[in-house]
């Protein structure tokens, strides 16, 4: 008889993030705007639609390039980065999964806010990591307390979102640049900027 791993057996049988489609089926109505899924209310641009239509008969039936070479290089060029600074994934959930698998092993401590993005927690638990939560302060993720918790516990990873979902609050770029200097050398800071386009430019840190 096939049995699950010890880590999987410890996981609760819940869904970390209920998608909008499931919520629509449950409610019996369709959301007019799905900001919680970070979707544009304007839809794709006409240029994007034409480009997708043009490629249907050419390449869409093939396996995609596993290195995403052209896409990574185009993004790197537009963002003034090296292509090695760009990774392509299945949305934020896929990218978080890659990150966790790179860094977290059973028993590794991870710092996050109590009430932050649940799918991040799902990936950490699935890898056997130990989550340490820091409460929000005045509806904001408490950055100073996140750093203190990491220093005290010996955590290898800190996660927070800026702007934050679901609270909608945001920290200034200056504040984030200040706390980066306080992070332990053996700890990685993961900033989820999925909603960066909803905030003023001065709230997005210029991190080299």
Can you say where each PLM-predicted feature lies in the sequence?
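N-terminal small-domain helix-loop-helix segment of the aminotransferase-like
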Residues: 2-3, 7-93, 98
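Residue-level marker for buried hydrophobic side chains located in beta-strands
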Residues: 35, 189-190
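Conserved core of the PLP fold type I
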Residues: 60-184, 190, 195-208
């Amino acid at each position: 008889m096939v049995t699950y791993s010890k880590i999987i057996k410890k996981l609760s049988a819940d869904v970390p993030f209920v998608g909008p489609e499931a919520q629509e089926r449950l409610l019996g109505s369709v959301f007019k705007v799905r900001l919680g899924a970070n979707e544009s209310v304007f839809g794709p641009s006409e240029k994007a639609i034409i480009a997708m239509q043009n490629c249907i008969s050419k390449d869409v039936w093939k396996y995609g390039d596993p290195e995403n070479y052209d896409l990574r290089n185009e993004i790197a060029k537009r963002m003034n980065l090296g292509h090695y600074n760009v990774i392509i994934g299945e949305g934020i959930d896929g990218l978080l999964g890659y990150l966790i698998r790179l860094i977290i092993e059973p028993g590794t401590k991870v710092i996050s806010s109590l009430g932050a993005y649940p799918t991040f927690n799902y990936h950490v638990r699935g890898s056997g990591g130990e989550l340490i939560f820091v409460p929000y302060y005045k509806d904001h993720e408490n950055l100073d307390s996140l750093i203190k918790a990491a220093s005290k516990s010996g955590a290898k990873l800190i996660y927070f979102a800026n702007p934050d979902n679901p609270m909608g609050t945001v920290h200034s770029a200056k504040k984030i640049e200040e706390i980066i200097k306080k992070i332990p050398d053996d700890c990685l800071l993961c900033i989820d900027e999925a909603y960066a386009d909803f905030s003023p430019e001065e709230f997005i840190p210029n991190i080299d």
